[in-house]
Amino acid sequence: MAENKKFSIRKKRECSYPTFRTLYEFNKFFLRYKTEISKIQRRTSSLIQYEEHSSAIFIYYETPQMFDLATKALQTLYNSHTREGETKAASKWYRNPRKDFPSQEAALVRKKKRDALILKKYLLNVDPSLSFRAEGLFTLPSDDLDVYEFFGGENLTLFNQVRVDCQCYIHYLPKLAAFYVRCDSVKNLKVALKRVKHIFYEQVSLIRLERTQPILHLMNFDDYSTSYELFYDRNFPLAKKYKPNSIYLHRLPESIPTPVDSVKINLIRERSFNLLKNFVSASLFNVFLFSGTVFMRVKVGIPLFERLKVGTNKVKNNSVNIAQSFLEPQTRSTFLRYLFSDEVSVKVCHVLKELRSPTGEKLFESFSDDPITAVHFEVMNCKGVQDTLTAIWNTNSGKPSGWYLESTMYKALDVTYYNLNTLSWNLYIEYGHPTQNSTFYKEFISNISMSDDGRIYFMNTRDIKVRSLVVKLKHKYWHLSSGFHLHITRFEAHDMGKVKDIDTDFEPGLQCYQVGSDTSVLRYGLSFWDPKWDYLLADNQHKQQWQAPSYKPLISEFFPMGIEHFIETAQSIVMAVNRSTID
């Protein structure tokens, strides 16, 4: 075949894979899969040529990375459409996976019948004089709750699944204000008491939230603005915008009108900002950004705050002394999260390094010039099981520096602080480890790479295909005066094959996604983390859920100066950043 002049400036190299058994199979492959091969050429910016009589394959490429991608894509294409790689039945199943199987359906029916018989047995009222090998009580911390009303009547139907799984009797003793659990196994008793405890506190938190009066919470840090957005959302999503049905203001002065159908209060006097800040209830309840105004969201109930995911903090700047002692894998976290508009966020990333205090001192220091990139792949394997695989880059190109599966993550620490009258919080650390039986996932991750221009390459195989992906670019900064870590994160989501202008699909083979090409779901976030918490948790990161931590699970351990002080410090940082975007 004649060479195309457009590709004459590129390097030419013979490709040794895939290997074909006969010359007929070789020519048939290139004639039959012209469309798929042209797709590989388009996504790798390369040219693939073959010689009909010698079975030689040549690739014209720009970079060695593109040559490797084109070679692997050809091999994947060959494996996916031949008897060695995938049978016709498997190929048909791949396109239309079967979800129900007769044997599984029969087993499910048998399990339902068996569970119904077990539940019928353990719902009976047992003679109190009978003794069991294992008996235990869970005493309610508060007796002002109507147990029968909120836990499923006299039979306490909310605990039915616990009865079935642990094969135990569960009753409520009003005089003792306790749940009475009896069974024939000490192991089952411990599990049952633990699950009863979790269900109780979860239900109590929901009840407390339902009884809470819907209060508007306002946090604004722009002293230069004369218009303030009021926003309330009962369900606490991060970025839901709609007009509130009602607004409750607390002890507002008469000079400020109370809106009924409007979401704006126009402030007349300069001091109105402080008046509004003092008189509007701004408890730990809501965090939002709405039309450029920074709001704050902190969860109430269970959990109040969380530490999520696992990552590796590699500190390149020698002046960040504290973080250097935590180079081992540790959690990426969120406690306070602020949402910014796109324009503000882009500007913030540019001005943080140049920000100075009134005395001329530097305010922020960057952890690295390159952002940390995390890509969450929502995948489905050949058995129809969905999972989320996360790949993390600490550099701006090349292979991922780490990866983990959501399904293989486990809790190394779980501490819950309950206070039925005020706030409760739950702190846990999740660690991800590649599973020992993840051959398909290891093959999938081996084909993931990122180019210098922000293109993410991966392979849909006969065993795993990607349904959607989320790209997160995190810029990490060190606030020098407070010691807080400040993370500005860009969130971008894409559904494979859903956008016509983006060259992605569900078919086996090479896929390429350009970061920034799908802005249909795009938002920015700002989060804070106190590195001192790492010292409290470093000794407990490998402890199992049932093991007690080495510290007291009290709010004072994490907030020795109070949660309010932590929030006020974070707010002051946001004020400084927000002012810089206006100047």
Curated annotation (Swiss-Prot):
Q: Name one Pfam family in it.
A: DUF7905
Sorted alphabetically, the Gene Ontology cellular component annotations on this record are: nucleolus; nucleus; pericentric heterochromatin
- GO biological process annotation, one example: siRNA-mediated pericentric heterochromatin formation
Entry-linked InterPro entries: DUF7905
Give the residue range of the signal peptide.
Answer: none
What name goes with this protein?
Uncharacterized protein C582.04c
| Annotated organism of origin | Schizosaccharomyces pombe (strain 972 / ATCC 24843)
